Amino acid sequence: MIKSIQQFEESGIKKLEKIIESFMKDPKDMASFVYGIRDEVIALGLDLIKETLEDCNQMLCDSAKRKQSWEVVRTDGKKLTTCLGTVCFEKTLFRNKQTRKTAYLLDRILGIESHERLTEDAEAKLLEEAVQTSYRKAGEETSLTDRVSKQTVKNKLHRLTFPQLEETKPEKKAVEFLYIDADEDHVSLQFKEKKGDLEVGENNWKNNCVLAKLVYVYEGIEPESPKSKRHKLVNPHYFSGVYEGADNAKLWDEVYAYLDSHYDLKKVKKIYLNADGGTWIQSGKKRIAGITSVLDEFHLQKYLLKMTSHLKDSVDDARKELCDAIKSGTKADFQEVVERLKVCAETEATEKRIEESGSYILSNWTAAKIRLKDRETVKGCSAEGHVSHVLSSRMSSRPMGWSRTGVDKMAHLRAYYWNGGDMLELVRQQEQELPVAAGAENEVLSCESILRWERHRHNKLGKYIESINHSVSTEVKKYAWFNAHIWGL
């Protein structure tokens, strides 16, 4: 680190002075001034990272503890892309004296694989961009002065695993009502198992759709601000993914685990499930006891409109009669109104549309009745809008083709993003924590080791050693801290 600062004192400051001089001559060129400062600061940062990593590698080479078990093979170059740019440094390959296996011990201490080219900060930046824009754009924004390929972005996404639910909180919330909204996004696939295996249907459309399921839990709705007409969900939490076949039960188990860990379910009077009545959604009632299904307002009004759109000036009266039959009548009363509407149909297509719409409401009869009767506690369903914002805006609103794995991982990542997840923490969740030798963190360096390190620094720095009056204790601390990691090898 000292060498980088020395170099900056000798050349970097002069460059900054020239940049400032240029700005003073032409104050209107603010952009060049800012860019120039930025470039010099980034260059200093990359030099500091390079020197620090090489110092760590040198500590490994000089370590008496390392020499007991590992011997030096050779020194190789290494490139790591950080969020600042690409750092080029040297690291040493060692061979274990007993097993004869080779390893880059610096990589072990840093917690990175030998072939890894991205640091965790760069990978976090990559995910922050990929969750909102394209793979290509994410690759361009990974680093300030460098980029990675869109293939690298895809590979990182496909290898993601997502953290398990956090442990039960000591104090659970006590609420009277909870709400679960559920719907799905229809995402286009490039292929099912391999390229070229998509089937074309009778209508000449490719059968290339996969469902990205979305479920979210919330406590109710409230105005965005005291005088606002817009509303927002209270403490929403999102779950998303493909969850095909038997995995659908896993989705609902995750929802239940969240409810059980965050709420005192014994004090909850009702849990409302707002949805369109899809099979995968209704199966959630088998995994979470006490759920009350409610037909979402969008689909209810959609099918009421289909049944009455041909009546022209009598639309409102017919729709009111249908709603009254659902709210206060029986299925027979509703079917009677449907039959009268079919008599007024002018074409077979209209009659068929009325029949299908009526059958949909009858198949979700109880859910539709609760929607119209229990207006005080039942909240409007925003599933369609949330699918658009949470999933479609990234996955299907524009012409895109995905792999099945890509759909599942991106859906999970979008839910993680909307839950306020930290991408850096997600990256760290992927890493295997390396074992540390017992007692290594308490290992005390000998006076001889400390003095040898200080003499080495003094010879290397020469006259500059006196210019940084606090550096001795700081360097000793760094040596001691890093030595504990060497003992853990």
Which residue ranges define each predicted feature?
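Short acidic, Pro/Gly- and aromatic-enriched capping/linker segments at domain boundaries
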Residues: 61-80, 368, 374
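Catalytic center-proximal scaffold of phosphoryl-transfer enzymes
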Residues: 1-51, 94-489
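Short Cys/His-rich metal-coordination motifs, predominantly Zn2+-binding knuckles/fingers
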Residues: 66, 83, 97-101
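Short, flexible, mixed-charge glycine/proline-rich loop motifs
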Residues: 71-72, 85-90
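N-terminal accessory alpha/beta regions
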Residues: 42, 46-69
